[in-house]
């Protein structure tokens, strides 16, 4: 004998109920129904969803069952087998900015599912550092313009960006949307060679470190890095000589320190070191030395080639050693992070940096070397927070004909001779009461 089971999908606009005939005493076997943007939560005996129906129940008479639905969230999460973390994939996400949380229900989100956000209309994507695995094609077929990820690739061996857009190898750069302009890589590990191979449409790139890579190595060739205008390296122990060579469009640069490492002096402590000594299209030659004597004797200087359009440099940490920015004629701005451990600005550090507009001496600086801003073009200088500076050395601002405004440190004791020699644009200056000595020709 047969009995009829009527399956009512139980929502406005639903298709007509379907009837399933089964043998009396059998259990219901039917695939779970689906509904866009909703998750099926089981069958109930009433349309009011008061009594759940157990699908293992033997059915001996005609019966009508009613579906229960729950609206899907924008993001869906799946608990890992060990119960310690979650993976994430799309629910009803409608496009636009996608922000993946670092935690869900008190546990870390560690994985983005393969194809988990494929073709969902995402334009800006943020993946937190808690994520250690991004599945293949996780963000495929989206016109993403800005992307923040903890690693380049899946974090599990496929160490190239195109993987998370569905590519099998780094050679398939076309998988990466050409709308992508800004890429931020989190974590603290340097990326692998060819991780961005062939992706020549980026113009804003932030990396956690470079290690022994050059930017050209990262992109699989120098031809792919000529469009990057904003570049940041946030950490790491070192940057190789010439690591940034070929970045001809560069306008803004953030570095973890000046030169090869945080503590290097000599050639390795010069800003131009990371751009190298070989010319490239869009570069200009600078001569940087380690003293004022080197400045007036270019044959004693080191030669570097720096992007012609580079205007702004942000230094995250470390001292500025002798001659560091000597003859950097295009720079208009050099700034330091608020938490930078900068205590020293060396001799001739900005000598000949003729385009400088304003400069704020970091609060932790206690010593500024002779000739530090001599022949520079700096117009305004703020030393008011650097209250450990007690001496303005000779020629610190000498021959600077553009300097118009300066705030001196409140604990200043000595202004040495020639400190402001030929600073003809400086009309007014407030000298702290703490000053006891002013050298000859100081002004």
Which residue ranges define each predicted feature?
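Solvent-exposed loop and capping/linker segments of extracellular ligand-binding repeat ectodomains
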Residues: 1-14, 19-37, 47, 51-443
């Amino acid at each position: 004998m047969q009995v009829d089971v009527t399956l009512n999908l139980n929502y406005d606009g639903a298709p007509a109920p379907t009837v399933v005939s089964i043998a009396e005493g059998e259990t219901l076997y039917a695939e779970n129904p689906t509904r866009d943007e909703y998750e099926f939560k089981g069958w109930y005996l009433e349309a009011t969803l008061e009594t759940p129906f157990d699908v293992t129940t033997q059915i001996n008479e005609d019966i009508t069952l009613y579906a229960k639905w729950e609206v899907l969230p924008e993001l869906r999460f799946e608990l890992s087998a060990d119960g310690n973390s979650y993976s994430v994939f799309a629910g009803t996400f409608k496009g636009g900015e996608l922000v993946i949380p670092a935690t869900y229900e008190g546990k870390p989100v560690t994985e983005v599912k393969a194809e988990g956000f494929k073709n969902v209309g995402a334009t800006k994507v943020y993946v937190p550092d808690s994520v250690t695995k991004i599945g293949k094609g996780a963000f495929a077929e989206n016109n993403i313009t800005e992307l923040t990820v903890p690693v380049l690739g899946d974090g599990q061996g496929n160490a190239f960006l195109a993987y998370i857009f569905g590519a099998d190898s780094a050679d398939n750069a076309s998988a990466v949307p050409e709308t992508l302009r800004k890429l931020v890589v989190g974590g603290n590990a340097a990326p692998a060679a060819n991780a961005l191979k062939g992706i020549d449409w980026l113009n804003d790139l932030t990396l956690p470190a470079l290690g022994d890579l050059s930017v050209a190595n990262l992109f699989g060739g120098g031809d792919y890095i000529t469009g990057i205008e904003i570049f940041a390296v946030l950490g790491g122990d070192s940057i190789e000589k010439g690591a940034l060579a070929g970045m001809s469009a560069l306008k803004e640069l953030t570095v973890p320190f000046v030169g090869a490492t945080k503590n290097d002096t000599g050639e390795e402590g010069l800003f131009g070191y990371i751009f190298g000594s070989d010319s490239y299209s869009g570069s200009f030659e600078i001569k940087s030395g380690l003293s004022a004597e080197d400045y007036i004797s270019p044959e004693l200087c080191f030669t570097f080639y720096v992007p012609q359009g580079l205007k702004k440099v942000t230094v995250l940490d470390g001292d500025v050693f002798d001659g560091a920015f000597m003859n950097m004629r295009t720079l208009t701005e050099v700034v330091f992070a608020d938490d930078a451990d900068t205590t020293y600005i060396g001799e001739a550090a900005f000598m000949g940096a003729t385009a400088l507009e304003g400069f704020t001496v970091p609060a932790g600086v206690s010593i500024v070397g002779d000739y530090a801003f001599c022949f520079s073009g700096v117009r305004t200088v703020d030393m008011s927070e650097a209250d450990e500076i007690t001496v303005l050395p000779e020629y610190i601002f000498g021959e600077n004909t553009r300097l118009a405004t300066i705030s001196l440190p409140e604990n200043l004791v000595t202004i040495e001779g020639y400190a402001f020699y030929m600073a003809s644009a400086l009309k007014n200056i407030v000298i702290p009461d703490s000053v006891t000595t002013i050298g000859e020709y100081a002004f």
